């Protein structure tokens, strides 16, 4: 089985697994020359398929890391425009405690007391899947989105000496699905 794994957040990356073993991995930043480039890693996917002599028809499953994705332009603005990032996150670097503004905004949005984060452009599921289907020509049934935190937990579990045994995995993340 050949799986193409994709993450579209900061440092957008694609990896190919063949029968559970990683056979290739590439980050979009290597091709765009933009550190921590975000969004659908089209160039990285193309490079992997070329390097591994694969075609999209060879891919059995595309696994997307996370159930949500954000617009590439917005993600890269947050990552590379310090003034915008400070305003968006509500943080002054010289006053870290002010970062509580972001958490208060998130809680307010969750309770319906405030708007969601200003300027955050979330892609619809249709837009997100179209990036994959239009690029690779794959049908939607071969694309699965996995919860962001489940992906972290799976990486920790399967990369540990406890793989195959009962184990508790705790993830602690600042952002991701549901946060």
Predicted regions and their residues:
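Short acidic/glycine-rich loops and adjacent helix/strand connectors
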Residues: 1-179
